[in-house]
Amino acid sequence: MKFSLILTLFLVLMVGCESSEKKTKSKSDNIRKVQNFHGKSNIKLTQTILDSILPGDIVLRRGDGPLSFHLSNTTKEVFTHCGIIVKENQQLKVIHSLGGQVSKQEIDGVQLSSLTHFVNYASDSLLYICRPIFVDSANYKVAKEAYKYLEKKIPFDHRFSMLSKDKFYCSELLYYVFKNINNQKNIFTIKKKHRAYMLLFSTFFNTNNFTKIYAIQPKIKY
């Protein structure tokens, strides 16, 4: 009886250890995949580049977190995060929407970051800056509209739904800013997948609507 009880406990421990080992291995594999995806940026914007940037320019980066990793896998696009460049006290900053769990500032939603801070978290040193040209005085209008949403403290859209205007994920912020200054006409490339609509970053490579200012990116055709 005693031997039987000891044997049973031994088997339970063995199974538990094996299960734990599998879970740990699976978790490690996932962490390794994410680690291979991101890393703090080594990008240093020169003064010449900084002088060429205007308020209202758009900046794209490849995000440095697990959400960006999965987003890139879903959209099959290089870039995963975007924002609108503005200027305060002669300093370039970025208005963008980020979830509180990944925001370095622990703000959930539309927020203001320095351009340096934004660039520092460009994973794999992938960065793209472009200028909107789809309406007259687009830069001024884009920056002004972005500030309106910043002042409203719009929270992050964790459901990633384009149907709601009271919460924004990153490209959704730009989607509504662009529509507001373009007589409610959409310029975003939209892709439907699994009953959801995705706002694609390929939008910013349309030379009819945007002009490239600066780019560090792989040679990919959009």
List the predicted regions and their residue ranges:
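Residue-level detector of flexible, active-site-proximal loop/helix-junction positions
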Residues: 101, 136, 194
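Sec-dependent signal peptide recognition
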Residues: 2-8
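Active-site nucleophile-His-acid catalytic modules used for acyl/amide transfer and hydrolysis
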Residues: 67-68, 124-189
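Activation targets extended, charge/polar-rich intrinsically disordered C-terminal tails
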Residues: 18-25, 158-222
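N-terminal accessory segments that precede or flank the first globular/catalytic domain
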Residues: 18-88
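Glycine-rich catalytic cores of cysteine/serine-nucleophile enzymes that process amide/ester linkages
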Residues: 61-127, 155-168
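C-terminal motif of bacterial Sec signal peptides marking the signal peptidase cleavage site
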Residues: 14-16
